[in-house]
Swiss-Prot record:
InterPro entries: ITPase-like_fam (IPR029001), Maf-like (IPR003697). It catalyses: a ribonucleoside 5'-triphosphate + H2O = a ribonucleoside 5'-phosphate + diphosphate + H(+); a 2'-deoxyribonucleoside 5'-triphosphate + H2O = a 2'-deoxyribonucleoside 5'-phosphate + diphosphate + H(+). The active site is at residue 73. Its cofactor is a divalent metal cation. It comes from the Bacteria. This is Nucleoside triphosphate pyrophosphatase. Belongs to the Maf family. The keyword Cytoplasm applies. The keyword Lipid metabolism does not apply. GO terms for cellular component: cytoplasm. It holds the Pfam family Maf. Its EC number is 3.6.1.9. Disulfide bonds: none annotated.
Length: 196
């Protein structure tokens, strides 16, 4: 079997791989996203997701040339603007009020490298339609959402309480969580990480 490394500290991505029984190691990349976002501010939010994934995976891949190494990132776009994770939970109300009753886009970017060379790149966009929730619901949500307010760019955990924010979604469940699993497992089978 081919050695497979996830170059990410994302707990949700690691959980997805574990739940799918995919053998992997975690070696977190120490790339500073803010530097890349500043240097590549010309990119669309969709292309930024792939750019960040590639930037994160490259140093880990070069350090472990025998392995397939996956970099993954996700960006959020609202009204054409790339939004970042909130630095503090107190800003979540304004973010969620801005999102209320409107769609936003989650762009997932995956880059798989071996010895620093690209093996596979993938992008997928999901459209999330936020419902016109009441102020009372928003108060309750903010009181109970906890870590999700700053852990994800949308101030929600789609797989948890955050699911109550939405009226509908267009996209794959795993892509919304930040790791499009089915296209990934197909390429992992092709490269000997998983059985055909």
């Amino acid at each position: 079997m081919t050695r497979f490394i996830l170059a990410s500290g994302s707990q949700i991505r690691a959980d997805i791989l574990r739940q799918a029984h995919i053998p992997f190691e975690i070696i977190k990349s120490d790339v500073d996203e803010s530097v890349i976002k500043a240097e590549r501010a010309d990119l669309s939010p969709r292309d930024m997701a792939l750019c960040l994934a590639e930037a994160k995976v490259e140093p880990v891949s070069l350090a472990h040339p025998d392995a397939l190494v996956l970099g993954a990132d996700q960006t959020m776009e609202l009204d054409g603007e790339l939004l970042d994770k909130l630095p503090q939970a107190s800003l979540a109300r304004a973010r969620l009020e801005r999102m209320r009753g409107r769609p936003h886009f989650l762009h997932s970017g995956l880059a798989l490298l071996r010895a620093g060379q690209p093996v596979w790149r993938y992008q997928q966009t999901s459209t999330i339609h936020v419902r016109g929730f009441s102020d009372a619901f928003l108060d309750q949500y903010l009181e109970n959402a906890g870590f999700a307010l700053t852990a994800s760019v949308g101030a929600y955990a789609y797989e948890g309480l955050g699911s109550q924010l939405f009226e509908r979604v267009e996209g794959d469940y795993y892509a919304i969580l930040g790791l499009p699993l089915l296209p990934l497992t197909a390429v992992l089978r092709d490269h000997g990480v998983l059985q055909q």
